[in-house]
């Protein structure tokens, strides 16, 4: 009843009215009416105060929510540098309780990339995605799907590069990383396949290999300014002189980043940061051209670049360009913000690419790694000309082959 002061006020008015009727106890009614009226007034004020407090509390909650809102929005719009999404059928591969070791294997991939390429890969997020197929996985870089594949979690992948052992029963497929013909086999077939000399791997290895090669192919995209700063700060601990000379007086961290990205784009390791920074410190006084500075660094890293291309006889097998081809490319160089590129007509470009295709089919390269040797002037431009069609071809200039290495020319690109 006390929750309704308006009702009490009405009752007070009624009693006051009754007190004026002849024969009624006027004084008693007036006293009671006055008491009820005062009570109604107090209750009304209390209710207004309580309502005001409730409104103020709601406003404070709204304000607090608004204060937190920017943080929540930032969490929603932020993207991971790199992440792996898996279908629910592959969850056991990442579940330690089920014997899965995917998390540990991916952590080892980051260490492997640091050792081999010298890059700092941020922690790779792994999560399930119910929108994927049951046994599908995708690798994303900054929110964009780069590669994908499907696994058979309870089977093994058997690969035969020669494609001669086609009698093995199983599910025919294509190995996702290198595009080799493969077969998913039962686990009890492993011994039979290995006796035939075939390569047999588990599903986790298939995914981890795919992830590793994806990181190597897109390392330049993963190397941001923050990662470069971390690398430079590490170098500064032991080699402060070269870092202090170079940064920030001669080059910014962003400019160093662009040089490192150029190297990684052609799969040149950046582990030897001291040599890289020494070269930049020497040459950035003469030029600020990022492409030219990259070429100077490549010259300084010549032995590092050539090491995996040299066979046991200290020789390197290469394909060269016909002087006419070199002349055409050299005479049509155009400079842009993205670097130097050859402005060649489509017919000539097609003829060069077709000749490259023919040469690749006829030449055997060490470790099956095609190497093209061109003049220093056109090396960056020739690389840009072929990289969309032949991204895995190594393009070297004469400056990048050490003097104690024999050059064996096994093919020539002509038009």
What do the predicted segments below correspond to?
Residues 1-41:
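Transmembrane helix-loop junctions at the membrane interface of multipass transporters and ion channels
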Residues 27-31, 42-55:
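Juxtamembrane/interface segments at transmembrane-helix termini
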